[in-house]
Amino acid sequence: MEAITTNGITLRRTVAAVQGEDALRAMGERIAGALGPAVTEWAITRGELTLVVQGSDIVYALTYLRDEPACAFRCFIDICGVDYPQRARRFDVVYHLLSLRHNMRVRVKVQTDAATPVPSAIPVFPAANWYERETYDLYGILFSGHPDLRRLLTDYGFEGHPLRKDFPLTGFVEVRYDQDEARVVYEPVKLTQEFRNFDFLSPWEGTDYVLPGDEKTSS
């Protein structure tokens, strides 16, 4: 058991946790050394290794992580997007990989903007196909070299990308089935409701009957 004191708070970590972090640190140093300037930074966060990679080098980095025996990150888990509107390159594209051989996960991040496409990961991991379509649909992030980059979750003709921070919570249109026209119709969002007059001054009258068990408190 190892004890670490931070701001007066003592945290104790098991030997397994310490050894796991040491293995992650060694893996991070190995990958950063092998990929060189392709990796701009790396860190260990919540027991997982996180790499930040240049967008133009993402295919090269993913290929190394998959094929290098010391890494063997061959399980492609997911791709997701993150939106930071205050940044010039507002989007993070995050790749999640798993190595069954080393019982280790790695998170690879690429920064981009709405106009700069990220090279598609399909040549390395074919399963990236639908993940990239989903990321494009929800964030508007472009992927160059994708064979069929079109929306996946939203409807035909949908405007905007719903997981961007500047997308309104209500959306732009509402969808309903019109009984008279016997079809689905799209209309502008309407949040108005009928005027309601709330009476806050009348006292609560309660009930005029006794519920089972209440007779004990009244007596």
Curated annotation (Swiss-Prot):
EC numbers listed for it are 7.1.1.-
The UniProt keywords, alphabetically, are: Cell inner membrane, Cell membrane, Membrane, NAD, Quinone, Translocase, Transport, Ubiquinone
- Chief subcellular location: membrane
GO CC, one annotated term: plasma membrane
Please give the superkingdom of this protein's source: Bacteria
Describe its membrane topology: Peripheral membrane protein
Catalyses which reaction(s): a quinone + NADH + 5 H(+)(in) = a quinol + NAD(+) + 4 H(+)(out)
Gene Ontology molecular function: NADH dehydrogenase (ubiquinone) activity; NADH:ubiquinone reductase (non-electrogenic) activity; quinone binding
Protein location: Cell inner membrane
SUPFAM superfamilies per the record?
Nqo5-like
- Enzyme class at the top of the EC tree: translocase
NCBIfam families cross-referenced by the UniProt entry = NuoC_fam, PRK06074.1-1, PRK06074.1-5
Q: How does it assemble?
A: NDH-1 is composed of 14 different subunits. Subunits NuoB, C, D, E, F, and G constitute the peripheral sector of the complex.
The record's similarity note reads: Belongs to the complex I 30 kDa subunit family.
- Role of this protein: NDH-1 shuttles electrons from NADH, via FMN and iron-sulfur (Fe-S) centers, to quinones in the respiratory chain. The immediate electron acceptor for the enzyme in this species is believed to be ubiquinone. Couples the redox reaction to proton translocation (for every two electrons transferred, four hydrogen ions are translocated across the cytoplasmic membrane), and thus conserves the redox energy in a proton gradient.
What name has this protein been given in UniProt? NADH-quinone oxidoreductase subunit C
Organism whose genome encodes this protein: Methylorubrum extorquens (strain PA1) (Methylobacterium extorquens)
